Swiss-Prot record:
Stated name of the protein: Gamma-butyrobetaine dioxygenase
Protein localization: Cytoplasm
GO cellular component, one term: extracellular exosome
Positions contributing to Zn(2+) binding: 38, 40, 43, 82
Family: Belongs to the gamma-BBH/TMLD family.
Organism this protein belongs to: Homo sapiens
Binding site for Fe cation: 202, 204, 347
Catalytic reaction annotation: 4-(trimethylamino)butanoate + 2-oxoglutarate + O2 = carnitine + succinate + CO2
Protein role: Catalyzes the formation of L-carnitine from gamma-butyrobetaine.
Length: 387
């Protein structure tokens, strides 16, 4: 009954349509929005789910000439005699009330966020189940969005497993290091990850203006001693920083920092970007962390008096990351694949001993959040429909 129309009428000189639903809720729809979203074949290409009507052809002051309704549809005639039909459930879903808009945004963008620290219970699923079953793939990606990290177990100890996950999502994110890349100690390494030393907490590739959203790391070979992985929930740490030191939070969320990456791998590259280390949306919510101390440039485009306060704020942020309450430490085993949110989590690695041969080998890849979210929405629909 929630999507059943009790009454529909034009208001405000026919510039608004009001619907009273059988659940006693009311919805208002501007006439210009209704005309813009006419679903007829002249105005909408159903095969592409895309609007054909041009803004140039839209009268922004249009009113409704005629309106009739039944329980499941509204029928509108416009001043030029154009005719539109709107389904009740389509209209109810797009109600302009604050509550309805918030509900739809939750459905579209999966905003639920579960913060964590050292108490994290690492979400774990079977690698083959994720590849084979939609229910498991949906659990994987929905948990990745909510918690920020999922471990998959049972992969092989051969390269190629992250490419399978890329196909499961859609496709991988190509960078200057290739579609996939090998994390192992190398002579004359072109990245600090390709050494045996400790890696401090960082996000990958802030030197790009659009850093990769999701990272995949498959353990092929693991060293006996050292090489433990460390992760921290950057969004949780930001909350703590804002509470403990609002000035430091303000500095890191307003100061543009230069990042650079220069070298040769998939091809030769010379990359430069500018990011705020803590990136906020228009509501002041943290949406991305951009921080890699190795690729933070020596160039710093700020007035001289702002340099020392920036370093003080950054030090406070990093100290919070490294607190025992914030970080979670674990060791990957051969066949494990760690998948995590590169915009939210910062990750690091403890040092390990170099031998005469490669003692630790991970294969990595990236995915874009747009690709991941696309697959997540499709999987939810399949699971809910029982397909």
């Amino acid at each position: 009954m929630a999507c059943t129309i009790q009454k529909a009428e034009a208001l405000d000189g026919a510039h608004l349509m009001q619907i009273l639903w059988y659940d006693e809720e009311e919805s208002l729809y501007p006439a210009v929005w209704l005309r813009d979203n006419c679903p007829c074949s002249d105005c909408y290409l159903d095969s592409a789910k895309a609007r054909k009507l041009l803004v140039e052809a839209l009268d922004v002051n249009i009113g409704i000439k005629g309106l009739i309704f039944d329980r499941k549809k509204v029928y509108i005639t416009w001043p030029d005699e154009h005719y539109s039909e709107f389904q009740a459930d389509w209209l109810k879903k797009r109600c302009f009330s604050k509550q309805a808009r918030a509900k739809l945004q939750r459905e579209l963008f999966f905003p639920e966020c579960q913060y964590w620290g050292s108490e994290l219970q690492l979400p774990t699923l079977d690698f083959e189940d994720v590849l084979r079953y939609d229910e498991h793939a949906y659990k994987w990606l929905s948990t990745l969005k909510k918690v920020g990290i999922v471990r998959l177990t049972g992969a092989s100890d051969k390269p190629g497993e992250v490419s399978k996950l890329g196909k499961r999502m859609g496709f991988l994110y190509l960078t200057f290091y290739g579609h996939t890349w090998q994390v192992q100690d190398k002579i004359d390494a072109n990245n600090v990850a390709y050494t045996t030393g400790k890696l401090s907490f960082h996000t990958d590739y802030p030197a790009l203006h659009h850093p990769p959203g999701v990272q995949l790391l498959h353990c092929i070979k693991q060293t006996v001693t050292g090489g433990d992985s460390e992760i921290v929930d950057g969004f949780n740490v930001c909350q703590k920083l804002k509470k403990n030191n609002p000035q430091a939070f303000q500095i890191l969320s307003s100061t543009f920092v230069d990042f650079t990456d220069i070298g040769v791998d998939y091809c030769d590259f010379s990359v430069q970007s500018k990011h705020k280390i803590i990136e906020l949306d228009d509501k002041g919510q943290v949406v991305r962390i951009n921080f890699n101390n190795a690729t933070r440039d020596t160039i710093f485009d700020v007035p001289v008096e702002r340099v020392q306060p920036f370093y003080a704020a950054l030090k406070e942020f990093v100290d919070l990351m490294n607190s025992k309450e914030s970080k979670f430490t674990f060791k990957m085993n051969p066949g494990d694949v760690i998948t995590f949110d590169n915009w939210r989590l910062l990750h690091g690695r403890r040092s390990y001993e170099a031998g005469t041969e490669i003692s630790r080998h991970l294969e990595g890849a990236y995915a874009d959040w747009d690709v991941v979210m696309s697959r997540l929405r499709i999987l939810r629909q399949r699971v809910e429909n029982g397909n």
